[in-house]
């Protein structure tokens, strides 16, 4: 069953990345690889949130968690495309842009990961908490 979770997650992540990258590239045809940058940072934010939330707050089986993180987010984000795009910038003698991309990707990824962790640990509002408790008791 684990492989099914990984396969479905991987399929969703890869297809999602393809469509989102195509959409962003139509909007931003510039030299800076914005699509990959946005996708990778979004993946870092989601990874931080999902791992923290599912390990600390939400009961979730390890197979589903692995399908969401390794499968879906692993296929959604892409280190290889980041590397190729950086190399193309360097080969095209766009060294300042390549360095900006490197720094913005690495620092941005760490910041987004930490932001996801922070968001997952925010306390639930009393209204949201009472809504969850009411649903668990069956008193809707």
From Swiss-Prot:
GO molecular function terms noted in the UniProt entry: fluoride channel activity; metal ion binding
One Pfam short name: CRCB
Membrane topology field: Multi-pass membrane protein
Similarity comment: family membership: Belongs to the fluoride channel Fluc/FEX (TC 1.A.43) family.
Keyword RNA-binding in record: no
Location(s) in or outside the cell: Cell membrane
Activity regulation comment: Na(+) is not transported, but it plays an essential structural role and its presence is essential for fluoride channel function.
Transmembrane segments: 4-24, 32-52, 70-90, 99-119
PANTHER family (alphabetical): FLUORIDE EXPORT PROTEIN 1-RELATED (PTHR28259:SF1)
GO CC aspect terms: plasma membrane
Reaction(s) catalysed by this chain's protein: fluoride(in) = fluoride(out)
InterPro entries: FluC
Species: Moorella thermoacetica (strain ATCC 39073 / JCM 9320)
Binding of Na(+), residues: 74, 77
UniProt protein name: Fluoride-specific ion channel FluC 1
GO biological process per UniProt: cellular detoxification of fluoride
Primary role: Fluoride-specific ion channel. Important for reducing fluoride concentration in the cell, thus reducing its toxicity.
Keywords associated with the record: Cell membrane, Ion channel, Ion transport, Membrane, Metal-binding, Sodium, Transmembrane, Transmembrane helix, Transport
Main location (coarse class): membrane
